[in-house]
């Protein structure tokens, strides 16, 4: 049985990244470090953002996290509360809704539909905003659908969000390096008017096959940095130093591995898309990013759970 449930690449972490961690251990980087991340690592993230998007981000606005979930949790924990509304995608990464419910806020889903090839509709998101809305969550490319929303739709959404200054934006861009067909990532760093209420989540897990290293980064509004730093200090203390030095090597090193992995994922994407659509009663949109396919099995007369069990046992 092939396990397709985990969102992790099946590639080995590149050797130069592992070597950097080993060197950090040999050099004696064994103790506590800054809760927001060692300066060199935050500077490396800032350089990478500049290289990819031509945008300057102050390293003091960057948090190094043990993966992506702390950014999700801290953002929702700080902004969500009873009486507040948080807008999120469905299908989407399921942790978001459970975190929203934990805070007592109301989860307001916006549907990703087959008519839109599972891409979010910016008009639908904007129409979901009320005076109680405190946070809009975006995942692009999307987990678990593999859909990718391009720049014109993001431009439209960003323009609409300018009219709602009471709303924060959490842009989950963890799959930003995994976009197909030569298309570019329409990052929310492109919108200067939103930076004071924008949280961007990204990291090393997907792009560099480092899921087990527990390394993520996020960029926060300056006014929230003291608060998220306190949460970091009082929860995980700091990300272990050798992993941060490995993260520096990943960001500053060659991108050959990233391109090689994407070539392989592209081959798999085309194969799984064709294979799923060849099955009677099954349709599947071509994934535009990440490494997921999200078939519609309603034509088989089964629901998703029944179809999964049938595939596993038969």
Regions found by a protein language model. Name each.
Residues 32-66:
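Conserved N-terminal alpha-helix of the aminotransferase class I/II PLP-enzyme fold
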